[in-house]
Amino acid sequence: MKLLVQRVNEAKVDINGITKSKINDGFLVLLGIHKEDNESDIDYCIRKLINLRIFSDEDDKLNLSIKDLNYEILLVSQFTLYASTRKGNRPSFDKCAKGEFAKNLYDNFIKKLKLENVPFQTGEFGADMKVSLTNDGPVTIIIDSRSE
């Protein structure tokens, strides 16, 4: 499982011209699911995500987490995070989880994130979404359960 985490001042997801979700300060998280991911990958990624200290404290050190500040998360499924560009110029999606398997893991990720009492919103799995954001920093971090 791979998370691309961007620290944002605001982010939103539009579907068919209608805003589905919008946050202010927090994380825009793009979630990629590998074809071999399981529940332990979800647990690892959520633990890292909510405790990731990439917000500045009073000494301007990156020392505070989203949980410390009660900031929000906007979670968006992004199967292309596991695209491979090793051969040729067209990406291969062989490592990406497919269909119902990916949807089940995405739904389980959401269920487990709810248990952490961190405010969050989501995009819509499988939808054609327009995602917009204002980066803060910018600060962008990749959390990858396959390289723990």
Swiss-Prot record:
Pfam family, one: Tyr_Deacylase
Assembly: Homodimer.
InterPro entries: Daa-tRNA_deacyls_DTD, DTD-like_sf
One GO CC term on file: cytoplasm
Any one GO molecular function term: Ser(Gly)-tRNA(Ala) hydrolase activity
Family that this chain belongs to: Belongs to the DTD family.
Gene Ontology annotations of biological process type: D-amino acid catabolic process
Tree of life domain: Bacteria
Protein name: D-aminoacyl-tRNA deacylase
Motif (Gly-cisPro motif, important for rejection of L-amino acids): 137-138
Function comment: An aminoacyl-tRNA editing enzyme that deacylates mischarged D-aminoacyl-tRNAs. Also deacylates mischarged glycyl-tRNA(Ala), protecting cells against glycine mischarging by AlaRS. Acts via tRNA-based rather than protein-based catalysis; rejects L-amino acids rather than detecting D-amino acids in the active site. By recycling D-aminoacyl-tRNA to D-amino acids and free tRNA molecules, this enzyme counteracts the toxicity associated with the formation of D-aminoacyl-tRNA entities in vivo and helps enforce protein L-homochirality.
Annotated CDD domains: Dtyr_deacylase (cd00563)
